[in-house]
Curated annotation (Swiss-Prot):
Residues 710-732 are annotated as: Disordered. The keyword Nucleotidyltransferase applies. GO terms for cellular component: cytosol. Belongs to the polyribonucleotide nucleotidyltransferase family. The gene is pnp. Residues 570-629 form the KH domain. This is Polyribonucleotide nucleotidyltransferase. Its cofactor is Mg(2+). It comes from the Bacteria. SMART domains: KH, S1. It catalyses: RNA(n+1) + phosphate = RNA(n) + a ribonucleoside 5'-diphosphate.
Length: 732
């Protein structure tokens, strides 16, 4: 049965969902269309029961964009799609984070969602459509799932909110936020903004939620028409007696630990000891109590001897203890109050050869952040279905295993690292200088050296500080903070600057970055239903206060960006040349521009409009390159001095010197030296670089072309210049 339903999102944007035509052997499939952008999502969930010791939900979300969707060929030798791009990885995470909380607890069957873009009109981005398609595919399947979920993008143009703005509309929008949620609650946020207020942020979320409700209703209608019953599964539950025994053995000790402020390492060690001893005591107790006959008669009693189940129940006790300590007493694991920020320390300029650096430490989370400045040639070429551009601002985030005291794989960038780096990049990008004001390519690298929560927000703070240390003229400093939530019934507590345990055992991870004037980026993941807007408003206001506190600490370390670039950073100088002179600067096969680079140490980039950008770490090299270029495009003028190259020698006549591109002049034998010269080759050789002065220009009566008379002797007679090595025109 083919079902197709559509909804008008406003401004003539029709979103349609179709199922029953494609990929019918998958457990569920849905095709979503907006404009000419079409996304197919499929879902398959294994019916093979998971292993008894499995304690996680193996959900895999893949998002892939076909180049054929936009009528393009893939690059590279093989001409086919390769590994996922950064855009594809980020979109897969966007979908995963919104869907994962909606699967029922205890559902641990291997599940794979594949979202494929088969058509792109290069105007409507497919990312949020992929989230809708994935949810619709699950809803028409028999896979257990709580509620339909939808994702939308919200923009704001001239104060008016808009759902799913297209690529052109986003250019004029001051908000770009992706929202995922059910009809009842928001479960995922991610986006960037141009310093908007907390109230404006809340309004954008509410506006997006209205569209989400409509799209969810569309999915619910489809599911009702298909009326496919959900498959049954039996989550493993510990017997009541086992829970009682474990609580008796561990709760008091875990409570003592929770109320004792400890560093991460000590807490982990002592908690592991409680787990080990409780496990051992529980196994000994039930081995003595249960006989093989009892277990055979009531197989569920065997769970009392399952180490994995026992550890899960100890974890449940630990979670309960921490949550009640926060809700009932307003205390946290490290002794802080609910809105207290951990101690902050900042060191600047600690990496001598970097173009800017900062070591930002907040509690037991530490980021070493460096910046590198480059030219336009260093920009990253990005080719997606909707855009092809050069990216001149980037932030790369690295999370090595030693940062959490573990061993692990080194090399390659994981999805989590790409996601955290992207969030930090979007947070700072909003205050980065324009290309006109600062024509550098900027690369920020954040290496996490220690981690106990909020490492991505430490990267935001450290990245801002490194830019300021490097003299990059950012508009305003940016700081970031991670907020948490503990909610039981109507009682809740919002936590500022959460620890790793508070993230793991809590209900929300809400990262907010911004300046003193507003929010520049956010990311939120919710693990529970029923997050109302009052809680969200509280979290945003508490985040604002925390953000300002951190900004104050950063301002003490460095109030404004340094007045000059770092010693080893390249200096960029731009000059304009006539378009028809570009070929002269480049030379045959790039010979001339390579020669300038070799002689001056400067990197030279020429735009089609004649803009020449010169990058060099030394002022002398920059000046030499500028003067050489000016010389190359200048017209011969009597009295000017040039640095030329000997092209030919006539012993009894003189030397022919190329003093401008493709322009030779004669240095007569009498003009080579103040002393008498009998043989030119005794003084000059072909290829020599010599300074010459243009002393005369005469027309050849036969050809009508100019003949140039040059003198080395005239240069030697002049007073010595302060910069003898400077190439190019002197005396202009």
């Amino acid at each position: 049965m083919i079902i197709n339903k559509a909804i008008d999102l406003g401004k003539g944007k029709i979103l349609s969902i179709e199922t029953g035509k494609m990929a019918k052997q998958a457990d569920g499939a849905a095709l979503v269309r907006l404009g000419d952008t079409m996304v197919l999502a499929t879902v398959v969930s294994s019916k093979t029961p998971p292993p008894a010791n499995q304690d996680y939900f193996p959900l895999q979300v893949e998002y892939r964009e076909k180049y054929s969707a936009a009528g393009k060929f893939p690059g590279g030798f093989f001409k086919r799609e390769g590994r996922p791009s950064e855009k594809e990885i980020l979109t897969a995470r966007l979908i995963d984070r919104a869907l994962r909380p909606l699967f029922p607890d205890g559902y641990l069957f291997e599940t794979q969602i594949i979202v494929t873009v088969f058509s792109s009109d290069q105007i409507n981005d497919a990312d949020v459509l992929g989230g809708v398609a994935a949810s619709a595919a699950i809803m028409v399947s028999d896979i257990p799932f709580h509620n339909s979920m939808s994702e939308v993008r919200v923009g704001r143009i001239n104060g008016e909110f808009i759902v799913n703005p297209n690529i052109n509309e986003l250019q004029g929008s001051d908000i770009d936020i992706c929202i995922g949620g059910t009809a009842n609650t928001i479960c995922m946020l991610e986006g960037e903004m141009k310093e908007i207020s907390e109230a404006e942020m809340l309004d954008a979320i509410k506006f997006g939620h209205e569209a989400i409700r409509k799209i969810c209703a569309l999915q619910d209608e489809m599911a009702a028409e298909i009326a496919r019953p959900q498959r049954s599964f039996a989550p493993v539950k510990a017997p009541a007696k086992l829970k009682e025994v474990i609580a008796g053995l561990s709760e008091t000790r875990l409570k003592e630990l929770a109320y004792t402020p400890l560093c991460k390492e000590d807490r982990a060690e002592k908690t592991a000891s409680v787990y080990k001893e409780t496990l051992q005591s529980t196994l000994e107790l039930f081995k003595a109590l249960l006989t093989p006959e009892e277990i055979a008669a009531e197989p569920e009693k065997a769970l009392c001897l399952n180490a994995h189940i026992i550890e899960e129940e100890i974890h449940a006790v630990e979670k309960k203890v921490m949550r009640h300590m926060i809700l009932d007493d307003g205390k946290r694991l490290d002794g802080r109050t609910l809105d207290e920020i951990r101690p902050i320390s900042i060191e600047l300029g600690i990496i001598p050869r970097a173009h800017g650096s900062a070591l930002f430490t907040r509690g037991e989370t530490q980021a070493l952040v460096t910046i590198t400045l480059g030219t336009k040639k260093d920009a990253q070429s990005v080719d997606t279905l909707t855009d092809s551009a050069d990216k001149r601002f980037m932030l790369h985030y690295n999370f090595p295993p030693f940062s959490v005291g573990e061993t692990g794989r080194v090399g390659g960038t994981g999805r989590r690292e790409i996601g955290h780096g992207n969030l930090a990049e979007r947070s700072i990008k909003m205050v980065s200088p324009s290309e006109t004001d600062f024509p550098y390519t900027i690369r920020i690298v954040s290496d996490i050296l220690e981690s106990n929560g909020s490492s991505s927000m430490a990267s935001v703070c450290g990245g801002t500080l490194a830019l300021m240390d490097g003299g990059v003229p950012i508009r305003k400093p940016v700081s970031g903070i991670a907020m948490g939530l503990i909610k039981e019934g109507d009682a809740y507590s919002v936590l500022s600057d959460i620890l790793g345990n508070e993230d793991h055992l809590g209900d929300m991870d809400f990262k907010v970055a911004g300046t003193e004037d507003g929010i520049t980026a956010c990311q939120m993941d919710i693990k529970i239903d029923g997050l109302d807007y009052h809680i969200l408003e509280t979290a945003l206001e508490q985040a604002r206060k925390g953000r300002l506190h951190i900004l104050d600490k950063m301002e003490v370390a460095i109030p404004i960006s340094r007045g000059e670039l770092a010693q080893y950073a390249p200096r960029l100088t731009s000059i304009q040349i006539p378009v028809d002179a570009i070929g002269l600067i480049i030379g045959k096969g790039g010979e001339t521009i390579r020669s300038i680079t070799e002689e001056t140490g400067a990197e030279i980039n020429i735009e089609d409009d004649g803009t020449v950008t010169i990058a060099c770490s030394s002022p002398e090299g920059t000046n030499a390159a500028v003067e050489t270029i000016k010389t190359l495009i200048s017209k011969p003028e009597i009295g000017n001095t040039y640095l030329g190259k000997v092209r030919d020698i006539r012993d009894e006549l003189g030397a022919f010197v190329e003093f401008l591109p493709k322009t030779d002049g004669l240095v007569h034998i009498s003009e080579i030296s103040k002393e008498r010269v009998t043989k030119v080759s005794d003084h000059l050789k072909v290829g020599d670089r010599v300074k010459v002065k243009l002393v005369d220009i005469r027309k050849d009566p036969r050809t009508g072309k100019n003949r140039f008379a040059l003198s080395i002797k005239a240069v030697e007679s002049e007073p010595e210049k302060s910069d003898e090595n400077k190439a190019g025109t002197e005396g202009n």
